[in-house]
Amino acid sequence: MVKKVVNTSGKRKTAVARATVQKGSGIVRINSTPVELYEPEIARWKIIEPLQIAGDHLDKVNIDVNVKGGGFMSQASAVRTAIAKGLLEYTGDPSLKIAFLDHDRSLLVSDSRRKEPKKPLGRGARRKRQKSYR
């Protein structure tokens, strides 16, 4: 018997999350920590969104996610994208895809925005020193 294992990834800024979805009993771990214990709480809420939308599909799978890079909210966004993609690929349910897209498109599509590089004569990408013509 061949085990069905699905590997997916999600990205946000410099955070990269890799999710492994396989047959199981509904356990979700992020960096070996159960999702119920993941801190900070606001990031946990963001991660739980695709799990709540999936509903009954979650009871038949275990999801292990490894995430690194970026800040805690970027990591949370990357994790939720990886989880949603993994569940969709594992189940192959078109109604689940519609539910994810209706809720939030970023569940299935990685956010491609990056930090704009700093330029000379200023403290940031756009801010410049004030000019005086007198």
Locate the predicted segments by residue.
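Beta-rich strand-turn-strand
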Residues: 73-80
